[in-house]
A protein has these predicted regions:
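Transmembrane alpha-helical segments that form core, pore/gating elements
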Residues: 18, 22, 26-34, 57, ...
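Loop-to-transmembrane-helix transition segments
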Residues: 13-21, 61-88, 132, 155-163, ...
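Hydrophobic/small/kink-forming positions within alpha-helical transmembrane segments
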Residues: 26, 30, 79, 83-87, ...
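C-terminal transmembrane-helix exit sites in multi-pass transporters
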Residues: 61-64, 108-133, 259-278
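Specific transmembrane alpha-helical segments of multi-pass solute transporters/efflux pumps
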Residues: 27, 65-100, 105, 141-142, ...
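Hydrophobic transmembrane alpha-helices of multi-pass small-molecule transport proteins
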Residues: 127-146, 276-293
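Membrane-interface helix-cap regions at the ends of transmembrane helices
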Residues: 4-5, 53-69, 137-150, 193-220, ...
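Helix-helix packing/entry segments at the starts of transmembrane helices
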Residues: 16, 48, 102-107, 174-193, ...
Length: 299
């Protein structure tokens, strides 16, 4: 049963915060690639960033240790889902085009529809079918329909696609959670990100988990610690609103990342963004809008 939350200032503030958080994620690829270029390819960039954030938050972890330990199982489960989403997404940013990574991540309306049918027992309406078809067609266009077989072309594509699946389920669980402080959810998210990244380092092979000298990590850490000034507000503005807003609305509001990410990738990195990418973007965004506004009409 959906939790009752007043549509007053709290939801408005959360919505504005999420739009800002999404826009901040839109330039997240820049520090990820800078760290990767420092000799930390694949999953290593994310490991350094999430580790730096946890180091900064150590005092908060210590102060809240009793509360964290009392609900560690719940936090670990949700932290694994949300952490996996952004661990995979972070890794994808250094292994495929930024635009492809962002668009493949934002197929969340498709996964949200499937989760609603399978987990929440929701009905399959015309609006939902339309959103599903639009999202899948947008995916095919982005992956090269008409030019080549529309299939993820590299490991980065697969990681971005998988990250959106984890986020769809993770944001649903965040919304369903009992009242747990957003700060604790952020800590769980960071721990989950580090945990999943560590697992990838163990089993990912040379492409994802190349051997790195400890000195390279130590050299990158001051930069990563400085970046937490930017990263921690971004993480909070992603996790906190997701505990208050319905998952469909979260997916739509976070799409401010698409606008910022696509523009910065085209301007700064010179990545291609032509008619095919624009069409895919419109279709995926339209699928998300159909999902949220169509759901409102049927409730």
């Amino acid at each position: 049963m959906p939790k009752s939350i007043s549509a007053g200032p709290t939801q408005l503030t959360a919505s504005i915060g999420l739009v800002i958080g999404g826009a901040m994620w839109g330039v997240y690829w820049i520090p990820v690639r800078v760290i990767a270029d420092m000799g930390l390819p694949g999953v290593w960039a994310g490991v350094v960033l999430y580790l730096a954030a946890l180091i900064v938050l150590l005092p908060i972890i210590w102060i809240n240790r009793k509360s964290l330990l009392s609900k560690w199982q719940t936090l670990l489960f949700v932290g694994f889902l949300t952490g996996a989403a952004f661990s995979l997404f972070t890794t994808s940013l250094s292994m495929t085009d930024v635009v492809r990574a962002i668009l493949l991540f934002y197929l969340t309306p498709v996964w949200g529809t499937l989760l609603g049918l399978m987990v929440l027992g929701e009905r399959l309406t015309i609006t939902r079918v339309s959103a599903l078809v639009l999202g899948l067609c947008g995916l095919l266009v982005v992956l090269g329909l008409g030019q080549k077989f529309p299939w993820p072309q590299n490991i980065g594509d697969w990681l971005a696609l998988s990250s959106g699946m984890f986020w769809a389920y993770g944001s649903m669980k965040l919304y369903q959670m009992e009242k747990i402080a957003a700060s604790e959810q952020v800590l769980a998210f960071l721990f989950g990100s580090l945990l999943v990244s560590g697992f990838i380092l163990l089993v990912g092979g040379p492409e994802l988990a190349a051997k790195v000298d400890i000195n390279v990590i130590l050299n990158a850490m001051p930069y990563a610690l400085l970046l937490t000034i930017y990263l921690l507000p971004m993480f909070y503005l992603t996790i906190w609103p997701a505990t208050l807003l319905a998952p469909g609305r979260v997916g739509v509001l976070l799409m401010s990342e698409i606008v910022v990410g696509v523009i910065t990738a085209a301007v700064i990195s010179g990545e291609p963004f032509g008619f095919r990418e624009a069409l895919g973007t419109v279709m995926i965004v339209s699928a998300a809008l159909l999902e949220i506004f169509g759901a409102r009409k049927t409730t």
